[in-house]
From Swiss-Prot:
Pfam families: Ribosomal_S21. GO terms for cellular component: ribonucleoprotein complex; ribosome. Belongs to the bacterial ribosomal protein bS21 family. One of its GO terms (biological process) is translation. Keywords: Ribonucleoprotein, Ribosomal protein. This is Small ribosomal subunit protein bS21. It comes from the Bacteria. HAMAP family: Ribosomal_bS21 (MF_00358). It comes from Nitratidesulfovibrio vulgaris (strain DP4) (Desulfovibrio vulgaris).
Amino acid sequence: MPGVYLNEDDYNFDIALRRFKKQVEKAGILSEMKKRQHYEKPSVMRKKKKAAARKRLLKKIRKMNMA
């Protein structure tokens, strides 16, 4: 779990907030929260995963044809 600790001598809220946001983004908390916001049936998850794989494959094929 990301956390930022402040010293009493070096109290700069803006810098601490920036560091915290960076840690949260690096940990992937926001994307995980958006993904879990609504229940998704396993069949829907499989369909999305399969569609993403197909999209990656088509992109790879297009890239190979361009080169």
